[in-house]
Amino acid sequence: MAFSSGNSGGPMADINVTPLVDVMLVLLIIFIITAPLMSHKVKVELPEANLIQKEDAEKRAAPITLAVKEDGSLYWNDEPISKEALESRLSTAAQQTPQPPLNLRGDRTTKMRTINEITKIAQGQGMLDVGFVATKEKGQ
C-alpha cells in the first residue's frame, strides 16, 4: 500500500524566507557598524558658568526698547519720542553704568535706511550694545 504525499507537482505555495532573513541580518550588521562612523562630532569646549557671571547678569540695566514705525515715528519704551529728544535720551543712557542695551524693533515695512539712521545716531551717542528684535515665523 503506497501513501501519497499530497504534492501533485503543482506550484509551491510557501515563500522561502531564509535568504530574505540572511540579507536583512547582513544589512543590520552593516548599519550597526557604520552608524557611529557617520556622525561627525565636533569637539567644542563649552565655557563653565560660575557665580560671578550670574551676579553680573543681575547688575545689568533694564533694556531700552526703541520701536520704529513705517512712517518713521519713534517710540521709546512704547512712548512717542522725537529724533531730537532721542539723541539726548541716548546720550544720557550711554553715560549710565552699567549701560542698558538698546533693542530696535522695526515694523515689517520700515525702510532699512530709517533703521540705519537710528543705529548711527545710537552709536554716535555712545551706545555700545545695539540689537534688533524680531519675531519667530509661524512656520518654525
Curated annotation (Swiss-Prot):
The keyword Membrane applies. The gene is exbD1. This is Biopolymer transport protein exbD1. It is found in: Cell inner membrane. The accessory proteins ExbB and ExbD seem to form a complex with TonB. The keyword Membrane applies. It comes from the Bacteria. It is a single-pass type II membrane protein. It comes from Xanthomonas campestris pv. campestris (strain ATCC 33913 / DSM 3586 / NCPPB 528 / LMG 568 / P 25).
